[in-house]
From Swiss-Prot:
Major subcellular location class: secreted
InterPro entries: C-type_lectin-like, C-type_lectin-like/link_sf, C-type_lectin_CS, Ca-dependent_lectin, Collagen, Collectin_CTLD, CTDL_fold
Record flagged with keyword Repeat: yes
Note: In contrast to mammals, which contain two copies of MBL (MBL1 and MBL2), chicken genome only contains one copy of MBL.
Keywords: Calcium, Collagen, Complement activation lectin pathway, Complement pathway, Disulfide bond, Glycoprotein, Hydroxylation, Immunity, Innate immunity, Lectin, Mannose-binding, Repeat, Secreted, Signal
One GO biological process term: complement activation, lectin pathway
Signal peptide: 1-19
Name of the protein in question: Mannose-binding protein
Organism encoding this protein: Gallus gallus (Chicken)
Glycan-bearing residues: K58, K61
Pfam families, alphabetized: Collagen, Lectin_C
Gene Ontology terms, MF aspect: D-mannose binding
Modified residues (5-hydroxylysine): K58, K61, K93, K96
């Protein structure tokens, strides 16, 4: 339907009204019929939809929903250690324990035997100390130099000290060298626990390792006639010597 149709209907209605009025002038006795404009018009047509209105104000917060409860989450990390709590009250006294096992007679006998052996060792040690006091010895630092009072060659002197659980004396500093020379008789010599038998001209300690201290006489060591051993003289100076020389004092080191 076009927009001209309503107007056409209106014009038609007006025309009918005019025609009716003309008819009434000729026949007054007849009843007059009229056609209202509204009733005679064609049906109205719906217009286009209007624009959306503006959003209204925000509503109030609704009540919590009543959905299903979710699963429990994983445990969180352990928190920091709390402060030490106060000491609790003292507990009740416990029951009396069982009687301990008595020490057997066999254990008593073992203890008695050990005590007797200790007394024997103490007596022996006392005698050894007295015997040692009759010999020449000197303490220096943590060392003790003991003169055997005997003269041997190098190998026999080394063996003698080893039997006593010691080694041939070998001073490692000036203080030890001075203490060692004080044990030597005038115009005498004592073997030192060093040798260059393994490498000529390179003296080593018998226990291994190069020398950390020496006090050689001027021009020594000179390796005269295969002199692989060394001695300390009463002056404190060192000299290389033939190891087979048996006229040398033996001084041990503890």
């Amino acid at each position: 339907m076009t927009l001209l149709q309503p107007f056409s209907a209106l014009l038609l209605c007006l025309s009918l009204m005019m025609a009716t009025s003309l008819l009434t002038t000729d026949k007054p006795e007849e009843k007059m019929y009229s056609c209202p404009i509204i009733q005679c018009s064609a049906p109205a047509v719906n217009g286009l939809p209007g624009r959306d209105g503006r959003d209204g104000p925000k509503g109030e917060k609704g009540d919590p929903g009543e959905g299903l409860r979710g699963l429990q989450g994983l445990p969180g990390k352990a928190g920091p250690q709390g402060l030490k709590g106060e000491v609790g009250p003292q507990g009740e006294k416990g029951q009396k324990g069982e009687r301990g096992i008595a020490v057997t007679d066999d254990l008593h006998r073992q203890i008695t035997d050990l005590e007797a052996k200790i007394r024997v060792l103490e007596d022996d040690l006392s005698r050894y100390k007295k015997a040692l006091s009759l010999k020449d010895f000197v303490n220096v630092g943590k060392k003790m130099f003991v003169s055997t009072g005997k003269k041997y060659n190098f190998e026999k002197g080394k063996s003698l000290c080893a039997k006593a659980g010691s080694v041939l004396a070998s001073p490692r500093n000036e203080a030890e060298n001075t203490a060692l020379k004080d044990l030597i008789d005038p115009s005498s010599q004592a073997y030192i626990g060093i040798s260059d038998a393994q490498t000529e001209g390179r003296f080593m300690y018998l226990s291994g390792g190069p020398l950390t201290y020496s006090n050689w006489k001027p021009g020594e060591p000179n390796n005269h006639k295969n002199e692989d051993c060394a001695v300390i003289e009463d002056s404190g100076k060192w000299n290389d010597l033939d190891c087979s020389n048996s006229n040398i004092f033996i001084i041990c080191e503890l």
